[in-house]
């Protein structure tokens, strides 16, 4: 059972508050000891075992605690000012139901404020509520329900019980509290703590309202109710947690320094995130970073932290191996100790004389070096007398040396004015305030002794190991560390930020580490040569005792052809080994003694000027020729041979190299002579490979493909894609060890990841698929949907927190697709256009393409630059935020574009139904009155069948067989003469004259006579001639009559033919005119079609350009991977394979610089393109609103003409518009008048047209007319068309360019602005020339289609030319007939006709007169009969019958 001891020291009351209370009690902790207990439960629980720390914060204090007894009133409240924190407690001793009262705590801030409202429901699970919201909270509340309605955008809206476990018995042990900071709020409620991070401003004013506490006293004692502890300053408590016992006490001595400098190591050796890193520095072997962030390997993994209370006179020895960690503060790690850090934790200046007298470094080989400093120039005899290594601020300059046996080996330099940290690495590096002060051989142990000091400051000793971390540095000191030890922390490291905003981030490539080596070579018979190089070093001392390497040191090569100066490789393989000896001398150059102590040295061969390192020769480097020489004659490069001592490296000789690049000679680590296939493959795992001379890191997998040619296969960027095993022909693929992915981070946690392969990553196990990628998430997709199917937006109902393009991720990790906003309908007002003055129009459909969005691009900068090489990644961190800037620029650009595109697009269901050509041409959606037409919206050719003439069923025609079997004689007949003649004759030729017909009173006979008729009339004629002399000429009368009748027929037929000719000529000429006009319209239609096809071709060309632009940019970016940017190779792995680390770093740095430049160029191009697309997106939006949803008034905005209507359709990355416009085909040229200037005596005034859509012009008849600008329709102007102006003067303002902004505020001289930018921001560096190449991505290739459209357009144009020629030919075929003379003959009627007419008149007239005058009731006969009847008989009355109704229909 854990024990708890509380040692309290009562602090005197130093402040107080004036409370508007009827009774006020100010007391110390008293019965409120549970406050400290609660505090310990919240804070000591996070401490590791074996901890001894001082905690400082705005904690509750021992005193004062206030008890305020107020009257039962709602309108009063207590106000506290300048607070940092507030704690309160509810005591339950002697409390009845009447004592349970409400409390409303309000902390005012901007824009957020805090309220904690407590009700009287002490036993309820939701008896209180905390609200952190925007707004102004009330000081009091009467609400019975707990809500946060007073504010908006609440950061915290949480209900909690007043008493733990909802039991009143636990209330007395409960602590409530609030702390507020500029970036966070901490709340202590019902035994739990909440920390909410956000930016806010706090006034420090707290109000306590609704304290309707009772004034009752129990047994004469004031009842404890609500108790308050206002906190104004930081309080410190010391917590010691050892062996399961926690001891807490007030900290009274150096509390602030202890909090700032001593921490408890967290499990895993991590330093707490809230540690201040006071006097901790970034260790560096080169220049010191002043301020910034970088990812680096630093000794920040603490194996043991040993706090030393104060300086004590003592001597200590600390070793890197086998260190005893018995005084550690926190957990202990058993990792290898890399660096021991001595940190002086002080806040005030510590004078010199308080520190170590000397630091002794026990190096390998048993040599002990000492480091000490002196305040003036010293002699050799006094080096060991009064030297020191002071901590803190020195009172003067200190000159430091490396000593050996009291002799100075090397002068190190001047000690910094203030020594705050000393760090010593086991690799022999000695750091002061982070700077590498000295380097020597590896160190085993450190010994030091401390001087006695009167200061009571303390210091710490930290045994640390190297780890990768994101380090923030300010003024050369570490201020914050983020360990790169988890998935989310790796992203933080890659983004160079400790706090990740919600968004998508590229997943950093994991470090490969030590992997197996795969080698693929061609099978061959190998011969092997071992090259042994012996280097004999000569060492001696200088006048001050420092070791000096002699330039007489000897290099011995194997003998070849009786020559030891040059050695060439003559075998297929070779291995090079170096053997080093060391001899010394006293003063001369005779080196016979063994090197001991500080004279001990080792020979090393450095890279020098060669593009490969000496120690990499046996790492499968290949050559066509390779020779080593001691002479520079004919050499390509050289190695530097150096003597490495305990203090420095000294170059003594040079080893020259003669080489040619190729594959004939291979450097190998061991002898492999004979017939061998030396290939070694490690399949299906990450391996470091050398495949036919190409090196890298990747996963090798066997494939089923068969390729006939080639040994290895690369991409355009030079990356190895696969290779062939020549022995069996098997093809192997090579893929990267790590595949780039995008992690979705919300509230600092990875909730999902987008990847191109179906493999678990980032610890995410739940996954789903989309058409373009796999998505892994913390969200567990239900079993209702089959895993691996395409996700549907309705699967998850949640609000996305982050979006990228058209996808979003919710807080629970679920992936949703963002739907476009739907609208209820379209409004399409009609308006006129602003055009010139045409007289005729033609309809044209014009195509226009506008880009609306670009495809989002995400680039893993470190992957592109380094391709996963761990050493390159370390170098890349030196470029600070270069990658972060590139990635964030692309991500922010994509998010901004997604937001704009999402807010732009709306979908109308009604408009969607008409969004296809079929629906637009269909009459189903039209009113019934229009459905009789086949196609309203289009011009389909099948509609012509309805206007073609139909067959006449009344006409009778013979069949084709009848036309073949019968001979036909076709003549022209007169009316019904021929038909009547045939009926009369009945087929008898003798009845020819009897059946003669009359046409217009003239006797006629059909003009055709058969053989029988000709015989009959010939006989009649012959008989008449023969008998004529005898008086028988009358026989020829039938012949004469028949001939004359037939001549009459011909004459009348000629007249009819003449009339028919006139009708025919008129009709033919009219037909020719119609044909000419029709062909003219066809010609015009084909011409317009040609122009339409040209616009379609241009639009498609623009679509192709838009789609391929990004691919070209990516191709451009990919091609840069082939450029070496003046490095020895474009392959980073190959560079590190050939060179030592330092030389390779210099070469790789060139690649990093070049590739970052290429990335910056790509990002600049992308952002520029996005800016252009943003403008075109607004243009598309304007065109949708003005062209599609309404009718444009602007000429040329919706097509080149007067706009009628437009259709929009989706196109790759944009929208394509089909504008239907009226194109003027004929114009009327007029002289427009701006107005009329009139004189009235001495007064001059002007008249201008009121309507700006009208044009005033003066015609040839000197009259003024007005016409609309849309079409030439002149009319006479009236007075109502004009308005009067004051004068006729026209004023012009003469201004310079500098005056234009004062006249036109938004005027910008673009040319001058660009010129200023170029002058002021001219780069002072040279950007490498980047050439374009083909990118292996999908391209939209419409070149063939565009060429076909252009060819068809040209062919149609040629057709129009041919039609114009045909029209001219048709015009030349107009008929001009020669009219026949028409003779009119009048024939008088015979005498007997007139006789008959006279007889009829004589007979009929008397008869008619008699009938009219003598008959009837009033006639003469009628009157006579009536008189006779009346005389002979009496009068009788007629009998009448009843009248009946008569219906007339």
From Swiss-Prot:
Lineage per the UniProt record: Viruses, Riboviria, Orthornavirae, Pisuviricota, Pisoniviricetes
Species of the source: Porcine transmissible gastroenteritis coronavirus (strain Miller)
Keyword Signal: yes
Coiled-coil region list: 1104-1148, 1338-1380
Gene3D superfamilies per UniProt: 1.20.5.300, 2.60.40.3130
Residue stretches spanning the membrane: 1391-1410
Residues making up the signal peptide according to the UniProt record: 1-28
Entry function: S1 region attaches the virion to the cell membrane by interacting with host ANPEP/aminopeptidase N, initiating the infection. Binding to the receptor probably induces conformational changes in the S glycoprotein unmasking the fusion peptide of S2 region and activating membranes fusion. S2 region belongs to the class I viral fusion protein. Under the current model, the protein has at least 3 conformational states: pre-fusion native state, pre-hairpin intermediate state, and post-fusion hairpin state.
Residues in compartment: Virion surface: 29-1390
Region of interest called Heptad repeat 2 (HR2), as start-end residue ranges on this chain: 1305-1402
Subunit structure: Homotrimer. During virus morphogenesis, found in a complex with M and HE proteins. Interacts with host ANPEP.
Notes concerning its domains: The KxHxx motif seems to function as an ER retrieval signal.
Cited Pfam families: CoV_S1, CoV_S1_C, CoV_S2, CoV_S2_C
Intravirion side: 1411-1449
Keywords of this entry: Coiled coil, Glycoprotein, Host membrane, Host-virus interaction, Membrane, Signal, Transmembrane, Transmembrane helix, Viral attachment to host cell, Viral envelope protein, Virion, Virulence, Virus entry into host cell
Annotated spans, S2: 777-1449
Keyword Metal-binding recorded: no
UniProt cross-references to PROSITE patterns, sorted A to Z: COV_S2_HR1, COV_S2_HR2
Domain of life: Viruses
Annotated protein name in UniProt: Spike glycoprotein
Family matches, as InterPro entries: ALPHA_CORONA_SPIKE, CoV_S1_C, S2_sf_CoV, Spike_S1_CoV, Spike_S2_CoV, Spike_S2_CoV_C, Spike_S2_CoV_HR1, Spike_S2_CoV_HR2
Subcellular location(s) of the protein: Virion membrane; Host endoplasmic reticulum-Golgi intermediate compartment membrane
GO terms classed as biological process: endocytosis involved in viral entry into host cell; fusion of virus membrane with host endosome membrane; fusion of virus membrane with host plasma membrane; receptor-mediated virion attachment to host cell
């Amino acid at each position: 059972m854990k024990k708890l001891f509380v040692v309290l020291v009562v602090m005197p009351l130093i402040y107080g508050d004036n409370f508007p209370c009827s009774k006020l009690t100010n007391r110390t902790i008293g019965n409120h000891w549970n406050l400290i207990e609660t505090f310990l439960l919240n804070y000591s629980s996070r401490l590791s075992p074996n901890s001894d720390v001082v905690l400082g914060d705005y904690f509750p204090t021992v005193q004062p605690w206030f008890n305020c007894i107020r009257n039962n009133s709602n309108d009063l409240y207590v106000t506290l000012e300048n607070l940092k924190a507030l704690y309160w407690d509810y005591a339950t001793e002697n409390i009845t139901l009447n004592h349970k009262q409400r409390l409303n705590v309000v902390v005012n801030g901007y824009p957020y404020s805090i309220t904690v409202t407590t009700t009287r429901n002490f036993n309820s699970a939701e008896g209180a509520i905390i609200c952190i919201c925007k707004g102004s909270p009330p000081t009091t509340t009467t609400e019975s329900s707990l809500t946060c309605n007073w504010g908006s955008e609440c950061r915290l809206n949480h209900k909690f019980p007043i008493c733990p476990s909802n039991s009143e018995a636990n209330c007395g042990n409960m602590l409530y509290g609030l702390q507020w900071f500029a970036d966070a709020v901490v709340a202590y409620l019902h035994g739990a703590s909440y920390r909410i991070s956000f930016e806010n401003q706090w006034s420090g004013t707290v109000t306590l309202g609704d304290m309707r506490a009772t004034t009752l006293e129990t047994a004469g004692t004031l009842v404890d109710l609500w108790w308050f502890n206002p906190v104004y300053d930081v309080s410190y408590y010391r917590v010691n947690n050892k062996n399961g016992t926690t001891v807490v006490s007030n900290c009274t001595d150096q509390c602030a320094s202890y909090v700032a400098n001593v921490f408890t190591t967290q499990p895993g050796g991590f330093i707490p995130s809230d540690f201040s890193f006071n006097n901790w520095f970034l260790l560096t072997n080169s220049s010191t970073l002043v301020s910034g962030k970088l990812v680096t390997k630093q000794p920040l993994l603490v194996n043991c932290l040993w706090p030393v209370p104060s300086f004590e006179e003592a001597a200590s020895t600390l070793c890197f191996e086998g260190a005893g960690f018995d005084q550690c503060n926190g957990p202990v790690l058993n990792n290898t100790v890399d660096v021991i850090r001595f940190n002086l934790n002080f806040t005030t200046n510590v004078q010199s004389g308080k520190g170590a007298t000397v630091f002794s470094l026990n190096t390998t080989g048993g040599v002990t070096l000492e480091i000490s400093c002196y305040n003036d120039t010293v002699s050799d005899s006094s080096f060991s007398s009064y030297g020191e290594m002071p901590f803190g601020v020195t009172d003067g300059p200190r000159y430091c040396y490396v000593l050996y046996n009291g002799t100075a080996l090397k002068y190190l330099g001047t000690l910094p004015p203030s020594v705050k940290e000393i760090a010593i690495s086991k690799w022999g590096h000695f750091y002061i305030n982070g700077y590498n002060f000295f380097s020597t051989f590896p160190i085993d142990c450190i010994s030091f002794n401390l001087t006695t000091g009167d200061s009571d400051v303390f210091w710490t000793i930290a045994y640390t190991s190297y780890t990768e971390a994101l380090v923030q540095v300010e003024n050369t000191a570490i201020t914050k560390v983020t360990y790169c030890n988890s998935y989310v922390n790796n992203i933080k490291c890659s983004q160079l930020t400790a706090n990740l905003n919600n968004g998508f981030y590229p997943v950093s490539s994991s470090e490969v580490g030590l992997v197996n080596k795969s080698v693929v070579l061609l099978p061959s018979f190998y011969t092997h040569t071992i090259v042994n190089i012996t280097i004999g070093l000569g060492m001696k001392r200088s006048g001050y005792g420092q070791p000096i390497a002699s330039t007489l040191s000897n290099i011995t090569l194997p003998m070849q052809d009786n020559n030891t100066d040059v050695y060439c490789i003559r075998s297929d393989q070779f291995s090079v080994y170096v053997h080093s000896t060391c001899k010394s001398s006293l003063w001369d150059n005779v080196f016979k003694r063994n090197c001991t102590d500080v004279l001990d040295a080792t020979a090393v061969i450095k890279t020098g000027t060669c593009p490969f390192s000496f120690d990499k020769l046996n790492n499968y480097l290949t050559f066509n020729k390779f020779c080593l020489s001691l002479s520079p004659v004919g050499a390509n490069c050289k190695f530097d041979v150096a003597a490495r001592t305990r203090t420095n490296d000294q170059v003594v000789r040079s080893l020259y190299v003669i080489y040619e690049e190729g594959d004939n000679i291979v450097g190998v680590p061991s002898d492999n002579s004979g017939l061998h296939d030396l290939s070694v493959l490690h399949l299906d795992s990450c391996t470091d490979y050398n495949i036919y001379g190409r090196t890298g890191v990747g996963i090798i997998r066997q494939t089923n493909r068969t390729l006939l040619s080639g040994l290895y296969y690369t991409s355009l960027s030079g990356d190895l894609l696969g290779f062939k095993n020549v022995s069996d022909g098997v093809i192997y693929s090579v893929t990267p060890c790590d595949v780039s992915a995008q992690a979705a981070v919300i509230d600092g946690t990875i909730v999902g990841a987008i990847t191109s392969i179906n493999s678990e990553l980032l610890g995410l196990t739940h996954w789903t698929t989309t058409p373009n990628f796999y998505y892994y998430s913390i969200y567990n997709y239900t079993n209702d949907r089959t895993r691996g199917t395409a996700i549907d937006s309705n699967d998850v109902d949640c609000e996305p927190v982050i979006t990228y393009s058209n996808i979003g991720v919710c807080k629970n990790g679920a992936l949703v697709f963002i739907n476009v906003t739907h609208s209820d309908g379209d409004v399409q007002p009609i308006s006129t256009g602003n055009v010139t003055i045409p007289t005729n129009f033609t309809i044209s459909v014009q195509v226009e393409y506008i880009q609306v969005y670009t495809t989002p691009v995400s680039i893993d900068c470190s992957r592109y630059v380094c391709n996963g090489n761990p050493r390159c990644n370390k170098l890349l961190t030196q470029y600070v935020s270069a990658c972060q800037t590139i990635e964030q620029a692309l991500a922010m650009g994509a998010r901004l574009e997604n937001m704009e595109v999402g807010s732009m697009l709306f979908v109308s269901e009604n408009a969607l139904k008409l969004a296809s050509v079929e629906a637009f041409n269909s009459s189903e959606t039209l009113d019934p009155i229009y459905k009789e037409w086949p196609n309203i919206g289009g011009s389909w050719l099948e509609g012509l069948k309805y206007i073609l003439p139909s067959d006449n069923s009344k006409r009778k025609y013979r069949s084709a067989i009848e036309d073949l079997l019968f001979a036909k004689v076709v003549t022209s007949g007169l009316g019904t003469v021929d038909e009547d003649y045939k009926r009369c004759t009945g087929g008898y030729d003798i009845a020819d004259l009897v059946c003669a017909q009359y046409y217009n009173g003239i006797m006629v006979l059909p003009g055709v006579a058969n053989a029988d008729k000709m015989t009959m009339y010939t006989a009649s004629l012959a008989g008449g001639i023969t008998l004529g002399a005898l008086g028988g000429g009358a026989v020829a009368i039938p012949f004469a009559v028949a001939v004359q009748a037939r001549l009459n027929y011909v004459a009348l037929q000629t007249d009819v033919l003449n009339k028919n000719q006139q009708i025919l000529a008129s009709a033919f000429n009219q037909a020719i005119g119609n044909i000419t006009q029709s062909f003219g319209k066809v010609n015009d239609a084909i011409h317009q079609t040609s122009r339409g096809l040209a616009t379609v071709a241009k639009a498609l060309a623009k679509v192709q350009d838009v789609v391929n632009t990004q691919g070209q940019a990516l191709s451009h970016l990919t091609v840069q991977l082939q450029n070496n940017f003046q490095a020895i190779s474009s392959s980073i792995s190959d560079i590190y394979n050939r060179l030592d680390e330092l030389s390779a770093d210099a070469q790789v740095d060139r690649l990093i610089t070049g590739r970052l430049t290429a990335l910056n160029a790509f990002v600049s191009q992308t952002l520029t393109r996005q800016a252009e697309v943003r403008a075109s997106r607004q243009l598309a939006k304007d065109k949708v609103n003005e062209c599609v949803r309404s009718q444009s008034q602007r000429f040329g905005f919706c097509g080149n003409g007067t706009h009628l209507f437009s259709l929009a359709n989706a196109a790759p990355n944009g929208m394509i518009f089909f504008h239907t416009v009226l194109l003027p085909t004929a114009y009327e040229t007029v002289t427009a008048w701006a107005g009329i200037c009139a004189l009235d005596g001495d007064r001059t005034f002007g008249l201008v047209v009121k309507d700006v859509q009208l044009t005033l012009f003066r015609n040839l008849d000197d009259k003024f007319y007005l016409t609309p600008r849309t079409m030439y329709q002149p009319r006479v102007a009236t007075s109502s068309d004009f308005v009067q102006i004051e004068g006729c003067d026209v004023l012009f303002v003469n201004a310079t360019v500098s005056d234009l902004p004062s006249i036109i505020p938004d005027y910008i001289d673009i040319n001058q602005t660009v010129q200023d930018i170029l002058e002021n921001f001219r780069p002072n560096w040279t950007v490498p020339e980047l050439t374009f190449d083909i990118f292996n991505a999908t391209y939209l290739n419409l070149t063939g289609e565009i060429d076909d459209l252009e060819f068809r357009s040209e062919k149609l144009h040629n057709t129009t030319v041919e039609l114009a020629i045909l029209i001219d030919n048709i015009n030349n075929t107009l008929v001009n007939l020669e009219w026949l003379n028409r003779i009119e003959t009048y024939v008088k009627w015979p005498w007997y006709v007139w006789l008959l007419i006279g007889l009829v008149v004589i007979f009929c007239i008397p008869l008619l007169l008699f009938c009219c005058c003598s008959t009837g009731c009033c006639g003469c006969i009628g009157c006579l009969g009536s008189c006779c009847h009346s005389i002979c008989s009496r009068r009788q009355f007629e009998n009448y019958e009843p009248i009946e109704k008569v219906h007339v229909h």
